[in-house]
Amino acid sequence: FPIHIKLDTGMHRLGFQENNLPELIKTLQGNEAVKVKSILSHMATSDDLAHKEFAISQIELFEKLSSQLMAELKIKPIRHILNTSGISNYPEAQYDMVRLGIGLYGVSNDDEEQKYLENVGTLKSVISQIRTIEKGESVGYGRRFMAERQTKVATIPIGYADGISRHLGNGVGYVIINQKKAIILGSVCMDMLMVDVTDIECKEGNTVIIFGERPTVSEIAKLLQTIPYEILTSISQRVKRIFYRE
């Protein structure tokens, strides 16, 4: 059976530590039932150059431990330690392969690098209904949006059950309708959210961009003080996926 050995070089989440190696080697020596296909580790700070010294220490420990395993077990497996940020910041540690994760989706943790990347995914919805409310009227649960003028409101059938954070409500987040920004009004509901389209020419059935070229996943992450990974992985399974091939 093929197996993959993960080494804990400082992340302290999963893997064999240095003091585990003698027992691991003893267990594997002469065991013909398994074959080591790869040795890997994971970097804790590859995206943060303020911790470059720690990152380098992880790479050095990985080199030491993986080399020890290879020598004592007389094997030549694939070795890998770098994720997306590691590929950019520590190219000298690419070994036999790298793990391009969020980079596959056109997202980088580096603002300068991001200029050369495009988001590969777009989250879309449509306008379900448009209504006009008067000054003093409210929108949504808790009346958290109170109109200060006559306001045209569009309802979009997507909400926090689909992965849209409630923290984007009350004017924090926005969507794009016909190339224009529409601010989210009041609270994001479970299955719907409402936006201000007072100054936007639009009609029911028009496409709504939740994220894509604008706003990007990274921009939404900054609004929520989180990371792009969380935005992407929060999109629930009930959201239909459409894949395009070139």
Give residue spans per PLM region.
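Active-site loop/helix belt of alpha/beta enzymes
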Residues: F1-P2, T9-V126, I133-E134
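Residues immediately flanking
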Residues: L7-T9, T84, I158, E213
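Amphipathic repeat-derived elements
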Residues: H4, A93, V172-I176
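C-terminal accessory subdomain/extension
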Residues: T132-E246
